[in-house]
Amino acid sequence: MEIAVFGGGAWGRALAFAFGEKNEVKIISRRDLNEPLKKLNDALISKGSAPIEQVDLQRGLKATLYVIAISVQHLREWFQNASLPKNAKVLIASKGIEVLNKAFVSEIAKDFIDPNSLCFLAGPSFAAEIIQGLPCALVIHSNNQALALEFANKTPSFIRAYAQQDIIGGEIAGAYKNVIAIAGGVCDGLKLGNSAKASLLSRGLVEMQRFGAFFGGKTETFLGLSGAGDLFLTANSILSRNYRVGLGLAQNKPLEVVLEELGEVAEGVKTTNAIVEIARKYGIYTPIASELALLLKGKSVLESMNDLIRRA
């Protein structure tokens, strides 16, 4: 087996499809994926590629490259159970911050694999568009440039993959944009207008960069595909789960109802709380994340947005 993809959700299936154009791919998931994989495999076979096969966890461990697409909140437990070789070549495609330990993805992973064997996938993309073969540009961040290029060379013809360093900047950008995307959904749901939305996203990008710079993230990362690119996509599209959370909150629905109706994981909800606690610990100014955290805890949506526009 060349590439093992862990995670049977929409994102995991999309990545399995993407890597399946050029490579033998197996997907590992607890759920039955026979029906979801049928259309994807039909498309791969029509291109002359091998179909994706679902396998169990034990068989999935014997691969050249590993792609991880599971919720960040379960990532530590997953690593504990998977028992990957310490030198396994891993690409993490999960965007968020672990709430329990206030840990970034790379901090979780370093307890289980060699940091030089780790890559992080960032940039603007939606699973629904990838499975249609629509073009996009992504970034593979790693301290190991050769490994980043190895993963980049495995991507399909419709994805332009850049290899860059600054793994901390890439993962913070990927996590933080989900937070701003919720606020973007609220802004649109309240019909506050294009000017307010532009102000929100611009200040959101500044806030993201400020937070990331504290931990060593590079400015160019936040101004590129991993930061600005992913932010502008996620905060403006109904295809974004986090954006849809914001739309629901704008209708004065309780968060529990919004998440139940969503039926999928929106990483930005828990990431918001993690960011606020980290920012409080280190004295980082995060007005948008801080106000959004109050909104998620039940503050009036109109009051939150009014306060946010004045503060951000």
UniProtKB/Swiss-Prot annotation:
Task: Write out the GO biological process terms.
Answer: carbohydrate metabolic process; glycerol-3-phosphate biosynthetic process; glycerol-3-phosphate catabolic process; glycerol-3-phosphate metabolic process; glycerophospholipid metabolic process; phospholipid biosynthetic process
User: Which keywords label this protein?
Assistant: Cytoplasm, Lipid biosynthesis, Lipid metabolism, NAD, NADP, Nucleotide-binding, Oxidoreductase, Phospholipid biosynthesis, Phospholipid metabolism
Quote any Pfam family the record assigns: NAD_Gly3P_dh_C
Q: Which reaction does it catalyse?
A: sn-glycerol 3-phosphate + NAD(+) = dihydroxyacetone phosphate + NADH + H(+); sn-glycerol 3-phosphate + NADP(+) = dihydroxyacetone phosphate + NADPH + H(+)
Q: What is its main location?
A: cytoplasm
Q: Where is the active site?
A: K177 (proton acceptor)
Disulfide bridge partners, by residue number: none
Q: Where in the cell is it found?
A: Cytoplasm
- SUPFAM superfamilies linked: 6-phosphogluconate dehydrogenase C-terminal domain-like, NAD(P)-binding Rossmann-fold domains
Q: Which residues bind NADPH?
A: W11, R30, R31, K95, A127, R241, V265, E267
* Entry's EC annotation: 1.1.1.94
Q: What GO molecular function annotations does the UniProt record carry, in alphabetical order?
A: glycerol-3-phosphate dehydrogenase [NAD(P)+] activity; NAD binding
Task: Give the binding site residues for sn-glycerol 3-phosphate.
Answer: K95, G123, S125, K177, D230, S240, R241, N242
| Gene Ontology CC | cytosol
Its annotated pathway reads:
Membrane lipid metabolism; glycerophospholipid metabolism
Homology family: Belongs to the NAD-dependent glycerol-3-phosphate dehydrogenase family.
The record's NCBIfam families line, in alphabetical order, gives:
PRK00094.1-2, PRK00094.1-4, PRK00094.2-1
Q: What does the UniProt function comment say about this protein?
A: Catalyzes the reduction of the glycolytic intermediate dihydroxyacetone phosphate (DHAP) to sn-glycerol 3-phosphate (G3P), the key precursor for phospholipid synthesis.
Q: What is this protein called?
A: Glycerol-3-phosphate dehydrogenase [NAD(P)+]
Q: Which organism is it from?
A: Helicobacter pylori (strain ATCC 700392 / 26695)
